[in-house]
């Protein structure tokens, strides 16, 4: 057991810094997981639903000190950001396309329906409180 002597007083102590650090790391991970779960809920509330595939695909991942929210559905970016004239830097003229039945359609694009960015950014105070609560309970 380490000991320290000064002015005739000897103090013995136990170094628990490893356990304290591990407890803090676990608390941060639990807090980030709580943030991820909350963000997924907010995104699922905001996403437009047709078949439910996009809503059901929204997940989160914790990697170290970071929490990511996202989806693996290929069209999610078009829902989030819009297309054509409705997306920043998008095409500014209408276009035509033929559907699977051979019918032609003219479009300007689709309006954005943000669900990931607002879920991540509009609840910073709540996420901060979730992390704080997790650390306080470590």
Residue spans for each PLM region:
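Short, Lys/Arg-rich flexible segments
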Residues: 1-76, 83-138
